[in-house]
Each structure stands twice: as structure tokens, then as C-alpha cells.
């Protein structure tokens, strides 16, 4: 959520930032609703003060009868009626909060202006792409190996699901353990095993609701399946005040993730790129406003480290204003090279959300010896999605005979297996 005080004091700048997100100017409407709300709150305070004064006089009166006493009683009753009506008006005046809840985060000054991914800015590349490399797509390889099943799975669960078998199932497990080990043993992240069912309020805190309600799966009793472990991880600090010396707090978690893929009809309908259910290792960092810029680079580097150890070519893109996620003020996308598609595809998104999520969930910190609290900054990064990493390995490590060479760093995790070959039932 955006800071209403900042909007109030920077109306022109606010409209300029909204225009960078391709949203029409809204400062005038917000200012009007804000004035109405503040007027009601001011009246409530005045009446509360008047009630306190008159109640004190009543309590100190020696005689609990007579015209003066009864007149004060009538005054207090009248004040209570006014307060009840004003508080009802305040509770019913949800338009301002509803409006604020629909605004995305304000872009950082370093974010390039642009409407879509074509305007994203290249930051760096890693590894070399070979235009003459073997170029079968991952689903062709997986099906030929008899280790990736879409057809029978569709009978069980419908489209956008997959069943992995044998050594591909083992590779999935190996990648999870490898990623968690790197992040915890080398990169100072603390492992968490969170729930995958959360309440709506946790989704709201993370910026998933109310804007993206249709993109998640809801149960019939008030829970939602998480679209990313970012949701439970950032909520670890909801409604807390953290001692400054404990920051940064860096968390890593592997979870299954669930997305309805609303609006993705016709996109990546074959293979494992876009599924309703997928596994992902997620990184979250909680830090101070002063350190969030450096922490953004750190958490992005953590995602890159996995790809470097797997020797997978990739590039880092700085997203433009029109391509950033809702809660982000600045985002790097990491795109891995896929020979089967002859293009880079997103494999990780690394975002600095500033105090956007913290304001929603009241996550604060304070210096030692101080009573003053400040909103934390939250950051998140994919570290990495297991399915898309498998896609990249299958396509970049494929051999002429259709087998898949295991990347060196995964051989021990695969029990010494160096190559995945076709499975014969």
C-alpha cells in the first residue's frame, strides 16, 4: 500500500508516477476522499474530547440530580449518538482504502520508462549461446525418455500439469536439495518450511489481493493455495517490531506453488513452462530502507549463483515501468537461454518492494534504546523454480542420442548418475 501522507504532499509527482505505470491521474480524487476522512476523524476527536470533559464534570458533581446534572447527561447522550453516527460514517467510507489498495508500487528512479517487455534494459549476460546447438524442446526430450507424462496426467488433473518419472523425478529432488544447500550454506539464508494454505489477509499483505484474486486457487473455507512462498515468508514479520540489529533477515523456502494462469490462455500450452502446480525455491529478505538497494543486488546475485553453478547461459534484465509486478518498485528478471526455443525465457524475478508490503502488514523495526519505529523494506527473488530449471538443463545438456548429461554440481545429488537415458517399462 502507498503512503497517503506522501501522496497528500506530492500530488503532482504521484500522478507522474502513476502515468509511468499507465494509470490515469488520481491525486485529485484521493485528495478529496482524504479530506473527507480526515474531517470525520477530526470531528470524532472533538466529540470524544467533549464527552471526556462532560463525563468528568458529571463524575465530580456532588448532587446526582437536578437540572444541571440532567442537562449534562443529555449532552453526553447526544455526543454518544453523534459519535456513533460519525464512526459509522468512517467505517462505511471505504472508498479511499479500496482505491489505495488497487494502486501498484511507485517505480524507483532507476527504472526505465516503457509499456512492455520490449522496453526492458539489458544489464548483463553470462555464458555463451550456441546457435548450432542441439535444439529439441524439453517436452520432446522428456517424452522420448519416457520420463515426462502429459497425456495420462491430463486424464487425472486436466491441462497444465505434468507427471515426472524415474530419473527426472530424481533430478527434481536433486535440484531442490542443491538449491537449498547453496542458499543456506554459502549465501546466509535461513531455511523455512511454511504452510502452502494461507488466509486472505496474508495474500493481501504480500500484494496478491485484492488485485489478483482470480490468479490464485481459493478453497471453500477461507484459504488460498500460495502462488509463491513469498506470501508466507514475508508474513513471518507481519505485525511485529524487529530489533535493528537482527536485520537483514534472509529466508529461503521450497514449496509447491499454485497458479490459475488466468489470462494466459494460448501461452506455453505445451511443456513445463507454465503449469498450474510447480515447485519453487523462494528467497525473501527483510531489511532497512538504507540497505534495501544493496540487498536487492545481493538477492539477485543469489539467484544468479544457482545458474552459474549449473553453467546455464542467462541474461539479467531491468524491467521497465510497464512490465514490473504490482508490489515491486524495482525488478530484475533473469532469463535463461533455451536452445529448443532459440530464445531467453524468464526463470527468476528479483524485486525490491520497498515499504509497500510492510505498510500493509505493519512490519516495523526500531533502533536499540529508541521507541520510534520505521517500516522495514521487503525483497524477494526466485531461487529458482524447479520446473523451469529442469527445462533449461534438458535443453542445454541434451545429447545426439536424446540422453541428458547431468551438470557436474548435481552428480552427487543424483547418487553418482552422470547421464539420464530412456526408461524402458
Curated annotation (Swiss-Prot):
Any idea of its EC number? 6.1.1.11
Which GO molecular function, any one, fits this protein according to its record?
A: serine-tRNA ligase activity
Q: Name one GO cellular component term.
A: cytoplasm
Q: What is its main location?
A: cytoplasm
The UniProt keywords, alphabetically, are: Aminoacyl-tRNA synthetase, ATP-binding, Cytoplasm, Ligase, Nucleotide-binding, Protein biosynthesis
Q: Residues that bind ATP, according to the entry?
A: 259-261, 346-349
Reaction catalysed by this enzyme: tRNA(Ser) + L-serine + ATP = L-seryl-tRNA(Ser) + AMP + diphosphate + H(+); tRNA(Sec) + L-serine + ATP = L-seryl-tRNA(Sec) + AMP + diphosphate + H(+)
User: Which of this chain's residues are annotated to bind L-serine?
Assistant: 228-230, 282, 382
Its annotated function is as follows: Catalyzes the attachment of serine to tRNA(Ser). Is also able to aminoacylate tRNA(Sec) with serine, to form the misacylated tRNA L-seryl-tRNA(Sec), which will be further converted into selenocysteinyl-tRNA(Sec).
> Domain notes, please?
Consists of two distinct domains, a catalytic core and a N-terminal extension that is involved in tRNA binding.
Instruction: Describe its assembly.
Output: Homodimer. The tRNA molecule binds across the dimer.
Family statement drawn from the similarity comment of this UniProt entry: Belongs to the class-II aminoacyl-tRNA synthetase family. Type-1 seryl-tRNA synthetase subfamily.
Q: What is this protein called?
A: Serine--tRNA ligase
- Taxonomic path: Bacteria, Pseudomonadati, Pseudomonadota, Alphaproteobacteria, Rickettsiales
